[in-house]
Protein backbone atom coordinates (compact mmCIF):
# COMPACT_ATOMS: atom_id res chain seq x y z
CA UNK A 1 0.00 0.00 0.00
CA UNK A 2 1.18 3.52 -0.84
CA UNK A 3 0.24 6.34 1.52
CA UNK A 4 -0.08 10.03 0.63
CA UNK A 5 -0.93 11.62 3.94
CA UNK A 6 -4.25 10.04 4.92
CA UNK A 7 -4.88 8.67 1.41
CA UNK A 8 -4.31 4.95 0.90
CA UNK A 9 -3.53 3.73 -2.61
CA UNK A 10 -2.84 0.18 -3.83
CA UNK A 11 0.69 -1.05 -4.32
CA UNK A 12 2.18 0.49 -7.45
CA UNK A 13 -0.68 2.93 -8.11
CA UNK A 14 -1.36 4.35 -11.55
CA UNK A 15 -2.00 8.09 -11.63
CA UNK A 16 -3.64 10.21 -14.30
CA UNK A 17 -1.47 13.26 -14.93
CA UNK A 18 -2.95 16.75 -14.90
CA UNK A 19 -3.22 17.93 -18.51
CA UNK A 20 -4.51 21.28 -19.71
CA UNK A 21 -7.66 21.00 -21.83
CA UNK A 22 -7.69 17.23 -21.28
CA UNK A 23 -8.06 16.27 -17.60
CA UNK A 24 -11.60 17.58 -17.17
CA UNK A 25 -14.36 15.72 -15.28
CA UNK A 26 -15.68 13.72 -18.28
CA UNK A 27 -12.22 12.44 -19.20
CA UNK A 28 -11.30 11.78 -15.58
CA UNK A 29 -14.49 9.77 -15.17
CA UNK A 30 -13.53 7.57 -18.12
CA UNK A 31 -10.06 7.00 -16.70
CA UNK A 32 -11.44 6.18 -13.26
CA UNK A 33 -13.79 3.61 -14.80
CA UNK A 34 -10.78 2.07 -16.51
CA UNK A 35 -8.47 1.69 -13.54
CA UNK A 36 -6.84 5.03 -12.64
CA UNK A 37 -6.05 5.03 -8.90
CA UNK A 38 -5.49 8.76 -8.39
CA UNK A 39 -6.31 11.66 -10.66
CA UNK A 40 -5.65 15.38 -10.86
CA UNK A 41 -7.54 18.30 -12.33
CA UNK A 42 -6.16 20.51 -15.06
CA UNK A 43 -3.74 22.99 -13.55
CA UNK A 44 -5.36 26.12 -12.18
CA UNK A 45 -3.80 29.57 -11.97
CA UNK A 46 -3.52 30.83 -8.41
CA UNK A 47 -3.98 34.38 -9.69
CA UNK A 48 -7.07 33.29 -11.63
CA UNK A 49 -8.63 31.77 -8.52
CA UNK A 50 -8.04 34.91 -6.52
CA UNK A 51 -9.57 37.05 -9.29
CA UNK A 52 -12.51 34.64 -9.32
CA UNK A 53 -11.99 34.05 -13.04
CA UNK A 54 -14.79 31.90 -14.42
CA UNK A 55 -12.45 29.52 -16.26
CA UNK A 56 -10.33 28.95 -13.17
CA UNK A 57 -13.34 28.44 -10.90
CA UNK A 58 -14.87 25.93 -13.30
CA UNK A 59 -11.76 23.79 -13.04
CA UNK A 60 -12.52 23.32 -9.34
CA UNK A 61 -15.47 21.09 -10.21
CA UNK A 62 -14.86 17.63 -8.79
CA UNK A 63 -17.24 14.73 -8.19
CA UNK A 64 -17.37 11.92 -5.64
CA UNK A 65 -17.00 9.18 -8.26
CA UNK A 66 -13.56 10.57 -9.10
CA UNK A 67 -12.03 10.20 -5.65
CA UNK A 68 -9.31 10.22 -4.63
CA UNK A 69 -8.61 13.38 -6.61
CA UNK A 70 -6.16 16.25 -6.32
CA UNK A 71 -6.53 19.82 -7.50
CA UNK A 72 -3.38 21.22 -9.08
CA UNK A 73 -2.44 24.88 -8.77
CA UNK A 74 0.41 26.94 -10.18
CA UNK A 75 1.87 30.38 -9.61
CA UNK A 76 4.99 32.31 -8.70
CA UNK A 77 3.77 34.41 -5.78
CA UNK A 78 3.79 33.00 -2.25
CA UNK A 79 0.78 34.92 -0.98
CA UNK A 80 -1.29 34.08 -4.06
CA UNK A 81 -0.42 30.40 -3.76
CA UNK A 82 -1.40 30.39 -0.08
CA UNK A 83 -4.70 32.11 -0.81
CA UNK A 84 -5.50 29.80 -3.71
CA UNK A 85 -4.82 26.75 -1.52
CA UNK A 86 -7.45 28.01 0.91
CA UNK A 87 -9.91 28.47 -1.97
CA UNK A 88 -9.17 24.95 -3.21
CA UNK A 89 -9.79 23.61 0.27
CA UNK A 90 -13.42 24.81 0.16
CA UNK A 91 -14.38 22.23 -2.49
CA UNK A 92 -12.85 19.43 -0.41
CA UNK A 93 -10.50 17.58 -2.76
CA UNK A 94 -8.38 14.79 -1.34
CA UNK A 95 -5.13 16.68 -1.86
CA UNK A 96 -3.54 19.81 -3.32
CA UNK A 97 -0.84 19.48 -5.96
CA UNK A 98 1.65 22.14 -7.03
CA UNK A 99 2.80 22.38 -10.65
CA UNK A 100 6.52 23.05 -10.96
CA UNK A 101 6.81 21.27 -14.30
CA UNK A 102 4.75 22.95 -17.02
CA UNK A 103 7.26 23.98 -19.72
CA UNK A 104 4.89 26.19 -21.74
CA UNK A 105 6.32 29.65 -22.39
CA UNK A 106 3.29 31.65 -21.22
CA UNK A 107 3.46 29.91 -17.82
CA UNK A 108 7.24 29.97 -17.50
CA UNK A 109 7.37 33.69 -18.34
CA UNK A 110 5.19 34.37 -15.31
CA UNK A 111 7.74 32.68 -13.07
CA UNK A 112 5.46 29.68 -12.56
CA UNK A 113 5.45 26.01 -13.56
CA UNK A 114 8.90 25.01 -14.80
CA UNK A 115 9.86 28.68 -14.57
CA UNK A 116 10.91 28.16 -10.95
CA UNK A 117 13.30 25.30 -11.70
CA UNK A 118 16.24 27.70 -11.71
CA UNK A 119 15.38 28.99 -8.23
CA UNK A 120 15.10 26.19 -5.68
CA UNK A 121 14.75 28.66 -2.83
CA UNK A 122 11.62 30.07 -4.49
CA UNK A 123 10.27 26.55 -5.02
CA UNK A 124 10.70 25.91 -1.32
CA UNK A 125 9.00 29.15 -0.31
CA UNK A 126 6.07 28.58 -2.66
CA UNK A 127 5.64 25.02 -1.44
CA UNK A 128 5.86 25.99 2.19
CA UNK A 129 3.23 28.69 1.68
CA UNK A 130 0.79 26.06 0.39
CA UNK A 131 1.62 23.41 3.00
CA UNK A 132 1.11 25.91 5.81
CA UNK A 133 -2.19 27.15 4.36
CA UNK A 134 -4.12 23.89 4.18
CA UNK A 135 -4.90 20.81 6.24
CA UNK A 136 -4.93 18.72 3.05
CA UNK A 137 -1.96 16.63 1.91
CA UNK A 138 0.22 18.58 -0.52
CA UNK A 139 2.08 16.95 -3.41
CA UNK A 140 4.33 18.33 -6.15
CA UNK A 141 4.88 17.55 -9.83
CA UNK A 142 8.13 18.75 -11.34
CA UNK A 143 10.91 18.04 -13.86
CA UNK A 144 14.57 17.09 -13.62
CA UNK A 145 15.77 20.68 -13.90
CA UNK A 146 15.89 23.61 -16.28
CA UNK A 147 18.27 22.00 -18.78
CA UNK A 148 20.83 19.21 -19.03
CA UNK A 149 23.50 21.35 -17.38
CA UNK A 150 21.36 22.28 -14.39
CA UNK A 151 19.63 19.08 -13.31
CA UNK A 152 18.82 19.65 -9.65
CA UNK A 153 16.10 17.12 -8.86
CA UNK A 154 18.14 15.55 -6.03
CA UNK A 155 18.32 18.83 -4.13
CA UNK A 156 14.72 19.69 -5.00
CA UNK A 157 13.40 16.37 -3.68
CA UNK A 158 15.15 16.65 -0.33
CA UNK A 159 14.26 20.29 0.23
CA UNK A 160 10.63 19.92 -0.79
CA UNK A 161 10.28 16.89 1.47
CA UNK A 162 11.46 19.10 4.33
CA UNK A 163 8.56 21.49 3.69
CA UNK A 164 6.09 18.71 4.43
CA UNK A 165 4.92 17.50 1.02
CA UNK A 166 3.52 13.98 1.02
CA UNK A 167 4.57 12.77 -2.45
CA UNK A 168 6.60 13.86 -5.46
CA UNK A 169 5.91 13.13 -9.14
CA UNK A 170 8.91 13.62 -11.43
CA UNK A 171 8.75 13.97 -15.20
CA UNK A 172 11.97 12.58 -16.64
CA UNK A 173 12.76 15.55 -18.88
CA UNK A 174 14.17 19.02 -18.36
CA UNK A 175 12.27 22.17 -19.20
CA UNK A 176 14.55 22.73 -22.20
CA UNK A 177 13.46 19.40 -23.66
CA UNK A 178 9.77 20.31 -23.49
CA UNK A 179 8.28 16.98 -24.69
CA UNK A 180 11.03 16.16 -27.19
CA UNK A 181 13.53 13.34 -27.05
CA UNK A 182 13.29 10.66 -24.40
CA UNK A 183 12.69 10.94 -20.69
CA UNK A 184 15.60 9.89 -18.48
CA UNK A 185 14.35 7.90 -15.53
CA UNK A 186 17.82 7.25 -14.12
CA UNK A 187 17.55 10.55 -12.25
CA UNK A 188 14.15 9.52 -10.87
CA UNK A 189 15.63 6.21 -9.73
CA UNK A 190 18.44 8.03 -7.95
CA UNK A 191 15.94 10.16 -6.03
CA UNK A 192 13.97 7.06 -5.05
CA UNK A 193 17.14 5.29 -3.89
CA UNK A 194 18.19 8.23 -1.71
CA UNK A 195 17.95 7.00 1.91
CA UNK A 196 16.89 10.48 2.99
CA UNK A 197 13.77 10.36 0.84
CA UNK A 198 10.79 8.86 2.66
CA UNK A 199 7.85 10.16 0.61
CA UNK A 200 6.43 8.22 -2.36
CA UNK A 201 8.14 8.96 -5.67
CA UNK A 202 6.09 8.65 -8.86
CA UNK A 203 7.71 8.50 -12.29
CA UNK A 204 6.26 10.22 -15.35
CA UNK A 205 7.24 10.32 -18.99
CA UNK A 206 6.97 8.03 -22.04
CA UNK A 207 4.89 5.28 -20.41
CA UNK A 208 2.73 4.15 -23.32
CA UNK A 209 2.36 0.38 -22.91
CA UNK A 210 1.93 -2.29 -20.23
CA UNK A 211 5.39 -3.69 -21.00
CA UNK A 212 7.10 -0.36 -20.50
CA UNK A 213 5.18 0.35 -17.30
CA UNK A 214 6.30 -2.89 -15.68
CA UNK A 215 9.82 -2.63 -17.12
CA UNK A 216 10.23 0.85 -15.64
CA UNK A 217 8.75 -0.25 -12.31
CA UNK A 218 11.30 -3.03 -11.98
CA UNK A 219 14.24 -1.08 -13.40
CA UNK A 220 13.78 2.21 -11.56
CA UNK A 221 11.99 1.16 -8.37
CA UNK A 222 9.41 3.95 -8.30
CA UNK A 223 6.38 3.74 -6.01
CA UNK A 224 3.95 4.29 -8.88
CA UNK A 225 3.58 5.73 -12.35
CA UNK A 226 1.84 8.85 -13.62
CA UNK A 227 0.43 8.54 -17.12
CA UNK A 228 -0.39 11.53 -19.29
CA UNK A 229 -0.42 11.64 -23.07
CA UNK A 230 -0.76 7.87 -23.48
CA UNK A 231 -4.18 8.04 -21.81
CA UNK A 232 -5.56 10.62 -24.25
CA UNK A 233 -8.15 8.78 -26.31
CA UNK A 234 -7.08 5.56 -24.61
CA UNK A 235 -8.31 5.49 -20.99
CA UNK A 236 -8.07 1.68 -21.13
CA UNK A 237 -4.32 1.88 -20.57
CA UNK A 238 -4.68 1.78 -16.78
CA UNK A 239 -6.53 -1.55 -16.70
CA UNK A 240 -4.25 -2.90 -19.42
CA UNK A 241 -1.21 -2.23 -17.24
CA UNK A 242 -2.85 -3.73 -14.17
CA UNK A 243 -3.91 -6.87 -16.03
CA UNK A 244 -0.44 -7.34 -17.50
CA UNK A 245 1.18 -6.88 -14.11
CA UNK A 246 -1.14 -9.41 -12.46
CA UNK A 247 -1.22 -12.06 -15.18
CA UNK A 248 1.60 -11.40 -17.64
CA UNK A 249 -1.01 -11.37 -20.37
CA UNK A 250 -2.31 -8.58 -22.59
CA UNK A 251 -5.89 -7.44 -22.64
CA UNK A 252 -7.32 -7.22 -26.17
CA UNK A 253 -7.49 -3.83 -27.80
CA UNK A 254 -10.83 -2.05 -27.34
CA UNK A 255 -13.34 -2.86 -30.04
CA UNK A 256 -14.90 -0.29 -32.35
CA UNK A 257 -18.03 -0.47 -30.23
CA UNK A 258 -16.07 0.20 -27.03
CA UNK A 259 -14.32 3.16 -28.64
CA UNK A 260 -17.62 4.59 -29.85
CA UNK A 261 -19.12 4.14 -26.39
CA UNK A 262 -16.18 5.93 -24.76
CA UNK A 263 -16.45 8.86 -27.17
CA UNK A 264 -20.21 8.96 -26.67
CA UNK A 265 -19.92 8.97 -22.87
CA UNK A 266 -17.29 11.69 -23.05
CA UNK A 267 -19.70 13.83 -25.04
CA UNK A 268 -22.74 13.12 -22.86
CA UNK A 269 -20.88 13.83 -19.63
CA UNK A 270 -19.40 17.03 -21.09
CA UNK A 271 -22.91 18.20 -22.01
CA UNK A 272 -24.16 17.40 -18.51
CA UNK A 273 -21.26 19.33 -17.01
CA UNK A 274 -21.08 22.41 -19.22
CA UNK A 275 -24.34 22.44 -21.12
CA UNK A 276 -25.19 21.16 -24.58
CA UNK A 277 -23.52 23.81 -26.75
CA UNK A 278 -20.25 24.13 -24.82
CA UNK A 279 -20.06 20.40 -24.19
CA UNK A 280 -20.35 19.63 -27.90
CA UNK A 281 -17.85 22.29 -28.94
CA UNK A 282 -15.22 21.31 -26.38
CA UNK A 283 -15.52 17.58 -26.98
CA UNK A 284 -14.96 17.80 -30.74
CA UNK A 285 -11.20 17.97 -30.24
CA UNK A 286 -11.24 14.57 -28.52
CA UNK A 287 -13.27 12.46 -30.97
CA UNK A 288 -10.48 11.36 -33.28
CA UNK A 289 -8.25 10.39 -30.35
CA UNK A 290 -10.51 7.45 -29.52
CA UNK A 291 -9.96 5.96 -32.96
CA UNK A 292 -6.22 6.39 -33.44
CA UNK A 293 -4.61 3.29 -34.88
CA UNK A 294 -8.00 1.81 -35.57
CA UNK A 295 -9.09 0.86 -39.09
CA UNK A 296 -12.69 1.72 -39.83
CA UNK A 297 -14.32 -0.28 -42.60
CA UNK A 298 -17.38 0.69 -44.56
CA UNK A 299 -19.46 -1.45 -46.87
CA UNK A 300 -18.39 -1.15 -50.51
CA UNK A 301 -20.65 0.85 -52.76
CA UNK A 302 -22.93 -1.28 -54.98
What is each residue range found by the language model?
Residues 1-5, 10, 19-94:
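Glycine-rich, positively charged N-terminal anion/phosphate-binding segment
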Residues 14-17, 39-41, 69-73, 96, ...:
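Hydrophobic faces of well-ordered beta-strands that scaffold small-molecule active sites
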Residues 20-21, 74, 142-147, 200-211, ...:
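Glycine-rich beta-to-alpha transition loops that act as phosphate-gripper elements at the mouths
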Residues 83-87, 151-156, 207-223:
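Catalytic cores of alpha/beta
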Residues 86-96, 105, 110, 122-177, ...:
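Alpha/beta enzyme core
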Residues 100, 172, 222-238:
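Glycine-rich phosphate-binding active-site loops on the catalytic face of alpha/beta enzymes
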Residues 234-250:
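C-terminal helical cap(s) of enzyme catalytic domains, especially alpha/beta-barrels
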Residues 297-302:
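Conserved small/polar residues in nucleotide/adenosyl-binding loops
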Amino acid sequence: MVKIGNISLPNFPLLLAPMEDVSDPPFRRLCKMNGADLMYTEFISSEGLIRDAIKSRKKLDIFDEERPIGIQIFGGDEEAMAMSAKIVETVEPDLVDINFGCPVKKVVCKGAGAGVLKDVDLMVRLTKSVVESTHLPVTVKTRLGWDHDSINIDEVAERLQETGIKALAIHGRTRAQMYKGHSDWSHIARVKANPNIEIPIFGNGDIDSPQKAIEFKEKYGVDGIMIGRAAIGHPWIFNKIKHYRETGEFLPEPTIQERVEAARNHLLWAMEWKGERTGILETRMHYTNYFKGCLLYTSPSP
